[in-house]
């Protein structure tokens, strides 16, 4: 199963995996009937249970999700799903924001809500997360000296990113209804 691509229902694929087989899952599943996927049914409870089963004890699941607005209210599906993963036994390790550079449906000047331009990236773990953070944020205070001319408390040249990740999204040359960076 390693280094393979399976173009099938994820429940079929995961059913062939042993317990604790996966170290990292990053996925952005369909949500709130925003798109039609030619007869695909999104069985969230079954998918969540299988993800928990196949995730390694030190594994991580990144669930990228958003909410539709229906009858003037956001659905809250993202939060219900996050709570369900926690109910199954996952720990909510981090709540991150995936900020897009543009929106398919920008707010109008006379609208009563702002342009929806982000999705949640819920980072779940079964146990302790040992992976290192991406440290590519340049520190403007690195090498700074105090008034006496001494090197102030050492500040590294680079620090970990924040939990808001900005991505440029594009559909150039991509024939997918929901492109992902």
What are these model-derived regions, one by one?
Residues 1-181:
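Core catalytic lobe of class I
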């Amino acid at each position: 199963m390693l280094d393979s691509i399976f173009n099938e229902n994820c429940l079929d694929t995961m059913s062939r995996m042993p317990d604790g087989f996966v170290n990292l899952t990053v996925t952005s599943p369909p949500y709130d009937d925003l798109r039609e996927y030619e007869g695909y049914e999104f069985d969230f409870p079954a998918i969540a249970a299988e993800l928990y089963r196949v995730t390694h004890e030190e594994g991580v699941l990144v669930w990228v999700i958003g909410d539709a607005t229906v009858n003037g209210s956001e659905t809250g599906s993202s939060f219900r799903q996050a709570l369900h993963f926690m109910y199954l036994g996952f720990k909510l390790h981090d709540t991150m924001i995936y900020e897009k550079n543009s929106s398919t449906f920008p707010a109008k000047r006379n609208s009563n809500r702002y342009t929806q331009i982000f999705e949640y990236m819920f980072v779940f773990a079964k146990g302790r997360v040992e992976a290192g953070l991406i440290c590519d944020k340049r520190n403007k205070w690195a090498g700074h000296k105090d008034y006496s001319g001494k090197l102030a408390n050492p500040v590294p040249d680079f620090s970990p990113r924040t939990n808001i990740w900005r991505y440029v999204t594009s559909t150039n040359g991509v024939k997918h209804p929901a492109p992902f960076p």
